């Protein structure tokens, strides 16, 4: 059972830096090796990440969600959800133009290896296109919990938040899981569809990163 002292709510724009710092700390041994392959990010880069988060909340409808320990007021975990849907009201599916417009590669950071950076996003984008096609869906882009607050149920609460949104809309939910995270997602109804990998040794890295692509079926509307 989740810790009763934990609450989940939408992130406010002024909390973007707190979320960024949690993401940076949690991603340090994994995804940061791709995002910042050439070294620890500068404060300027971290400020840019913070501004991108703030802009996503304010202008792009991205659903950043936080988990707070009410006994201390500390933000201990966060998630980034998006609802990918047709622009036209009443449309059941997106156009292929809408699909491709949403599958972009953001600009790399100063500390990125541009080719490795693009390869990750192209890997994820091509598989979203293949697996989801033109269908609407919720996607969990990011889930991060501070390691010292693990096993309190924060991650599960943030996943459940998005699953409930997907159920309300009657659409599927999708994510790219690490092998370690996949069992928790499975408990929320996500099913493995495909396993993909990015071999960082192609760019003088040390690791091969594996991702399990998982899909949660749409809840039938009654």
Protein language model regions, located:
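Helix-loop element at the rim of GNAT/NAT acetyltransferase active sites that forms part
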Residues: 21-40, 56
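Conserved acetyl-CoA-binding loop-helix of GNAT-fold acetyltransferases
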Residues: 145, 151-164, 187
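Conserved acyl-donor/pantetheine-binding loop and adjacent beta-alpha core of acyl/acetyltransferases
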Residues: 56, 72-150, 197-209, 221-222
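A short beta-loop-alpha structural element at the N-terminal edge
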Residues: 7-21, 32
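Conserved GNAT acetyl-CoA-binding A-motif
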Residues: 136-139, 165-178
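Conserved active-site alpha-helix within GNAT-family acetyltransferase domains
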Residues: 156, 168-170, 179-199
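Short hydrophobic/aromatic beta-strand or adjacent loop that forms the aromatic wall/cage
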Residues: 62-64, 208-214
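Active-site rim helix/loop that mediates acceptor-substrate recognition in acyltransferases
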Residues: 38-64, 68-70, 80, 121, ...
């Amino acid at each position: 059972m989740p810790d009763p002292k934990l609450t989940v709510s939408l992130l406010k724009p002024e909390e973007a830096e707190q979320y960024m710092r949690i993401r940076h700390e949690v991603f340090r041994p994994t995804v940061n090796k791709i995002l910042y392959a050439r070294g620890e990010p500068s404060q300027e880069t971290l400020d840019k990440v913070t501004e991108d988060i703030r802009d996503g909340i304010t202008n792009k409808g991205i659903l950043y969600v936080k988990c707070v320990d009410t006994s201390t007021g500390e933000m201990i975990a966060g998630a980034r959800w998006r609802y990918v849907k047709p622009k036209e009201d009443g449309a059941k599916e997106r156009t292929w133009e809408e699909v491709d417009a949403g599958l972009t590669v953001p600009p790399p950071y100063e500390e990125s290896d541009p080719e490795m950076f693009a390869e990750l996003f192209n890997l994820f984008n091509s598989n979203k296109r293949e697996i989801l096609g033109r269908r609407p869906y919720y996607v969990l882009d990011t889930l991060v919990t501070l390691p010292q607050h693990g096993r309190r149920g924060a991650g599960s609460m943030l996943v459940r938040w998005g699953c409930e949104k997907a159920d309300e809309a009657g659409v599927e939910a999708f994510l790219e899981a690490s092998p370690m995270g996949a069992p928790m997602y499975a408990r929320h109804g996500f099913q493995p569809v495909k396993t993909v990998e990015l071999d960082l040794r192609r760019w003088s890295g040390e690791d091969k990163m594996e991702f399990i692509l998982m899909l949660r079926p749409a809840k039938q509307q009654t």
